[in-house]
From Swiss-Prot:
It is found in: Cytoplasm. This is SsrA-binding protein. GO terms for biological process: trans-translation. Belongs to the SmpB family. PROSITE patterns: SSRP. Required for rescue of stalled ribosomes mediated by trans-translation. Binds to transfer-messenger RNA (tmRNA), required for stable association of tmRNA with ribosomes. tmRNA and SmpB together mimic tRNA shape, replacing the anticodon stem-loop with SmpB. tmRNA is encoded by the ssrA gene; the 2 termini fold to resemble tRNA(Ala) and it encodes a 'tag peptide', a short internal open reading frame. During trans-translation Ala-aminoacylated tmRNA acts like a tRNA, entering the A-site of stalled ribosomes, displacing the stalled mRNA. GO terms for molecular function: RNA binding. SUPFAM superfamilies: Small protein B (SmpB) (SSF74982). It comes from Ligilactobacillus salivarius (strain UCC118). Disulfide bonds: none annotated. The keyword Iron-sulfur does not apply. Gene3D superfamilies: 2.40.280.10.
Amino acid sequence: MAKSKPKDNALAQNRKARHDYNILETYEAGIALTGTEIKSVRASRINLKDGFAQVKNGEVWLMNVHISLYDQGNIFNHDPLRNRKLLLHKKEIKHLSEETQKKGITIVPLKVYIKNGFAKVLIGIAQGKHVYDKRETIKRRDQEREIRRTLKNYG
């Protein structure tokens, strides 16, 4: 029996980031969460749309990522928009810091998932696209789709 593809276990994805940015490199980082935050993340109640990461004092912080309040959290609930620390190796942090010093480069979260019981976030070093670049991408995607469609019908 053929092996099946491993399913994508993403709890949240930032699809808009791949449209708005050219992703140059990606890193897998752990994320420091409180008890009610991890319960909300496991329930897929997280929004990465406006999120970004910054390097401050040798640490990487994830900002503007909304993790909804946990329903049974009562007084122990967390602040939905608090800054969260990303867990990376020093070498990776140094590289991220050097890259973000360049003009037009930022760090964006691409995906949040659970791996071996721990929450992980896939972050990408990204460079902003211009409007004409976005149109080129859409045009190229449509052409490839049209080619696949004709090959399927006549091939």
